[in-house]
């Protein structure tokens, strides 16, 4: 009976923290990490999110962008898609927290990169785009968006890259990866140091201090992003490119 209880806790830890994920799907502590691990995971306040290992180091990112004109950033910068179109099925948010039009998340070090400050208590994220945890549902809409809209053709869309990724070995046999919502992406940023340490421990690609795309929408011309340089959460035009890192929920 003791062995059974240990296995269950080993399979799905209940303590808040960042873990690495083995090939069999087990979550294990960072101290047991090696390059055979397929992903990292964060558990916090009831949310369990698996974070993809390699981002644009994946062959699928290159495949998805192979038909585009050569540019230095075409394999890691992507459109949200269909600039000028309001996507039915994705809720629009015009505030970060129900009050402010932008804000700054608390860094794992304990400081903020600017004001206004966003509460570190994610249970208080009950309004505005931070209340959006529906990345999987949002992504089902974005998977159907394969053009930038109008004359915007410099980048692939995040949905197109996701489709290509899911159809490739890069998905590690999982078919439920998706583009994180703003709430999910914000949670990752708040644990960025630990997440990047875990990615390094499994020879993965660290999240960079750049613009990261969420699946949350602002209006027909804008979507929500998190700037991983300073934790700023704000809107960005759909015709501009951003990085994307796929995630999946752990049941």
Question: What residue ranges belong to the model's regions?
Answer:
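Short, compositionally biased
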Residues: 2-173, 238-251
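Conserved short hydrophobic patches within well-ordered secondary structure
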Residues: 42, 62, 178-180, 185
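C-terminal, surface-exposed recognition/capping segments
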Residues: 155, 164, 174-175, 182-251
């Amino acid at each position: 009976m003791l062995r059974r209880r240990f296995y269950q806790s080993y399979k799905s830890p209940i303590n808040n923290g960042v873990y690495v994920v083995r090939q069999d799907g087990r979550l294990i502590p960072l101290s047991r990490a090696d390059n055979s691990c397929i992903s990292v995971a964060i558990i916090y306040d009831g949310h369990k999110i698996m974070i993809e290992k390699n981002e644009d180091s994946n062959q699928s990112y290159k495949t998805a962008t192979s038909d585009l004109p050569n540019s230095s950033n075409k394999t890691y910068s992507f459109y949200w898609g269909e600039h000028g179109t309001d996507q039915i099925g994705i809720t629009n948010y015009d505030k970060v927290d129900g009050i402010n039009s932008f804000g700054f998340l608390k860094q794992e070090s304990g400081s903020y990169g600017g004001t206004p400050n966003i509460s570190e208590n994610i249970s208080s994220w009950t309004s505005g785009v931070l209340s959006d945890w529906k990345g999987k549902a949002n992504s089902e809409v974005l998977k159907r968006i394969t053009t930038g809209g109008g004359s915007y053709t410099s980048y692939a869309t995040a949905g197109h890259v996701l489709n290509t990724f899911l159809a490739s070995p890069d998905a590690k046999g999982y078919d439920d990866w998706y583009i994180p919502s703003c709430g999910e992406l914000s949670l990752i940023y708040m644990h960025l140091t630990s997440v990047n340490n875990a990615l390094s421990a499994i020879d993965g690609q660290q999240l960079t201090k750049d613009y990261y795309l969420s699946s949350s929408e602002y209006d027909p011309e804008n979507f929500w992003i998190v700037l991983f340089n300073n934790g700023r959460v704000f809107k960005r035009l759909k015709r501009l490119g951003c990085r994307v890192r796929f995630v999946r929920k752990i049941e």
